[in-house]
């Protein structure tokens, strides 16, 4: 991302001002939502983004290891190793990590969505989820291409096993479903086991109804 583009993006992020007995404090909207234990996974999954998300997960665990965390996902996917870094941190920390798809969760985005705490994996009504096998652009000498191809196959086997675990689908069904780009609507993703619920409105707690 160029500096000019980054400046434009930063300028578009709203600021929130809060009053306290110490005076006014301002936060960008994402920092304010982090206080509510909400983390956004937005855009390409890559190493820098993964580092920021892992740091936020670890910070929230240190702040309160017993309180749930929620990842809001709107991502076309990205680098497998970056996604696995986020995944492993989600599994490593003590708080339960719920996942919610808004917009899309494709490729590694769908993997992170499925890896959320069972019963806490949600998609909004008009979101879409896409699963497929990992790909790689092998180049160089024949021996190097062969090494890269073996690594892609090994990574594919590992991801298929994890998808099978999170969806409770047979590994054969996962391999078949992920052979090519496979786009699912929210209800289809629920039936497949990638998510647990489809929401069009935030659930209202019983005490709020009274």
Curated annotation (Swiss-Prot):
Entry annotation: catalytic residues: 107, 132
GO molecular function: ATP-dependent peptidase activity; ATPase binding; serine-type endopeptidase activity
Record has Transport as a keyword: no
Record's keyword terms, sorted: Cytoplasm, Hydrolase, Protease, Serine protease
Subcellular compartments: Cytoplasm
Gene3D superfamilies listed in its UniProt record: 2-enoyl-CoA Hydratase, Chain A, domain 1
InterPro entries for the chain: ClpP, ClpP/crotonase-like_dom_sf, ClpP/TepA, ClpP_Ser_AS
Main location, first listed in the record: cytoplasm
EC id: 3.4.21.92
A Pfam family of this chain: CLP_protease
SUPFAM superfamilies cross-referenced by the UniProt entry: ClpP/crotonase (SSF52096)
Recorded catalytic activity of this chain's protein: Hydrolysis of proteins to small peptides in the presence of ATP and magnesium. alpha-casein is the usual test substrate. In the absence of ATP, only oligopeptides shorter than five residues are hydrolyzed (such as succinyl-Leu-Tyr-|-NHMec, and Leu-Tyr-Leu-|-Tyr-Trp, in which cleavage of the -Tyr-|-Leu- and -Tyr-|-Trp bonds also occurs)
GO terms under biological process: protein quality control for misfolded or incompletely synthesized proteins
GO CC terms, sorted: cytoplasm; endopeptidase Clp complex
Record function comment: Cleaves peptides in various proteins in a process that requires ATP hydrolysis. Has a chymotrypsin-like activity. Plays a major role in the degradation of misfolded proteins.
Similarity-based family: Belongs to the peptidase S14 family.
Subunit structure: Fourteen ClpP subunits assemble into 2 heptameric rings which stack back to back to give a disk-like structure with a central cavity, resembling the structure of eukaryotic proteasomes.
HAMAP family given in the database record: ClpP (MF_00444)
Protein name per Swiss-Prot or TrEMBL: ATP-dependent Clp protease proteolytic subunit
Gene: clpP
């Amino acid at each position: 991302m160029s500096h000019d583009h980054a400046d434009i993006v930063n300028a578009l992020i709203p600021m929130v001002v809060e009053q306290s007995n110490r005076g006014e404090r301002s936060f960008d909207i994402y920092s304010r939502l982090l206080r509510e234990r909400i983390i956004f996974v937005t855009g390409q999954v890559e190493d820098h983004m993964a580092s920021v998300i892992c740091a936020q997960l670890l910070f929230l665990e240190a702040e309160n290891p017993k309180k749930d965390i929620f990842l809001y996902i709107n991502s076309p996917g990205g680098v497998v190793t970056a996604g696995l870094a986020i995944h492993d941190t989600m599994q490593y920390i003590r708080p339960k990590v719920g996942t919610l798809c808004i917009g899309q969760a494709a490729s590694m985005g769908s993997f992170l969505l499925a890896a959320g705490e069972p019963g806490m994996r949600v998609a909004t009504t008009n979101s879409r989820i896409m699963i497929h096998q990992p790909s790689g652009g092998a180049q160089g000498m024949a021996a190097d291409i062969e090494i890269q191809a073996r690594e892609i196959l090994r990574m594919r086997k590992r991801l298929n096993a994890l998808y099978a675990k999170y969806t409770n689908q047979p590994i054969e069904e996962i391999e078949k479903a992920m052979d090519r780009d496979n786009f699912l609507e929210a209800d289809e993703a629920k039936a497949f086991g990638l998510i647990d619920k489809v929401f069009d409105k935030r659930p209202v707690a019983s005490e709020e109804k009274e």
